[in-house]
């Protein structure tokens, strides 16, 4: 608004450091989410893969989406769904299925979430917030399908060359070609 800037706001996070899937699963009665730094990423990923098919967790998220999109900005006095300072909504920061078995339910959930966002807000763009095929268990067809949803306006990809072992921090110049090739 004031500075002629617009924001891309994500509505949830896949990762434990800001709640994410584990938060919703815990509040849906699925038990305590493992903490990656304490319990390891395999335990964390196994637990959060349940999110894709947990309807109670989805409803908690949908209630949050309804609250945020219809909330009134106390400075502009506009509902967020009408606020021109917002460019777009992202369903999440790096949403993932966390297992190949969860992919069908993951795609279904993203379609439901994007439909809800569109039904509440026709003024702003909507996106997934994805890591590309990496967020779809390296299934590029899954990524293409979720991007083709009629309620998704654009797709993005978060790239993590170090995390995905495409480049080594101490050999970046040598590994740049591999990282570049893998982004295509």
Name each model feature, range by range:
Residues 1-183:
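Active-site mouth of glycoside hydrolases
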